[in-house]
């Protein structure tokens, strides 16, 4: 009995679920019926409006062409009537002269005859009939106003509802990835004059193959494209690839997307490695700020943790409050934090080949800052540019302003104002490290060296801050300058 009740309960549950599904489907069908009525009324209204527009155009054309016929008829009628009136008057004058001549011919008085004959002769000379052109000024042919609308009639008879546009085909051979821009070119398989615009979608990915159904990044949409090409500008290439697809749209409907393509977007990505930074630097992923209390705060926390319960003396420098190298050993390859007066932080990604580019913006009020590259082996007490393990540009705004290139404790003064944003270009295999004004791409300095170890981006700042921009491709202007100036570089050989 209990088993039967349980079975009946299951049946009731199943029926209730099915009833709910059916009710939902019924509601959906009713909504679809309403939508059919509304959408039908909408497209019918649009169709009537389009035909009314065509009718209006035809009526306007008809009135315009009828007016042309009327104007031509009036002009020709006016000319012919004037010519007819002139000829009629000439004929009447000629007939009068003819009658006078006949009467004179029958006269018997010789003296009267001679006088009349002379007058008739003079009258004939001045007669209008002899000065008139007996050729009509205009033609009665109106064939130039004939029409043949057979072709237009066929076009009207071919009117139909808008077809769904075909899917475009992306032309990879004509597409280009350069200067953090992507230029995409596509074409339509069939000529379609009804296409109103195109929609382009793109998203970043780290997967090389065909686009996957699920990605961490959503599709970004660009609408209203009128041509069969488009350039995406101002991109940050923080992932290895980009998926792109395009669809065509007419006034009514959008077609299917093209086959998606995957374009490689090579660029140098790194973050600041906080485990290497001086304690007086507050480091985030791509920015750092000098903090006079940073080392002291760390020292206080360390001492409190050890139970010593006393703070560092206010007169102590940040370097004096820094724990020993053994205690500050970093988890990244045994790299210790920089200390003493080396207010330095390194990037977290090695450069062991190829070309790379990044930009750095320093706070204008920074008292001193530097940027460049260094070997991982750069000592924790060593400042950028003062050993053979690092190359940098250094700006000093404290007491006496200076802008210099430094390597192996050798200095070259640069005859250039300090830009608000600096670009760094490293060509590892060519042994070139170049610095540019990031805005104008003016070359500031180039180091020539033979790099014997992988490099790390390196930065230093005192009483200031900086922001790094990564995910950048080597700009075309920089590549051109490097090729053009490879033989006559601005580098100082004494700094290599």
Swiss-Prot record:
Key words, A-Z: Cell cycle, Cell division, Coiled coil, Cytoplasm, Cytoskeleton, Methylation, Microtubule, Mitosis, Nucleus
Gene behind this protein: Fsd1
Protein name: Fibronectin type III and SPRY domain-containing protein 1
Biological classification of the source: Eukaryota, Metazoa, Chordata, Craniata, Vertebrata
Main location: cytoplasm
Annotated organism of origin: Mus musculus (Mouse)
Omega-N-methylarginine PTM sites in chain numbering: 310, 320
Top-level division of the source organism's lineage: Eukaryota
SMART domains (alphabetical): BBC, FN3, SPRY
Subcellular localization: Cytoplasm, Cytoskeleton, Microtubule organizing center, Centrosome; Nucleus; Cytoplasm; Cleavage furrow
Residues covered by the B30.2/SPRY domain: 290-477
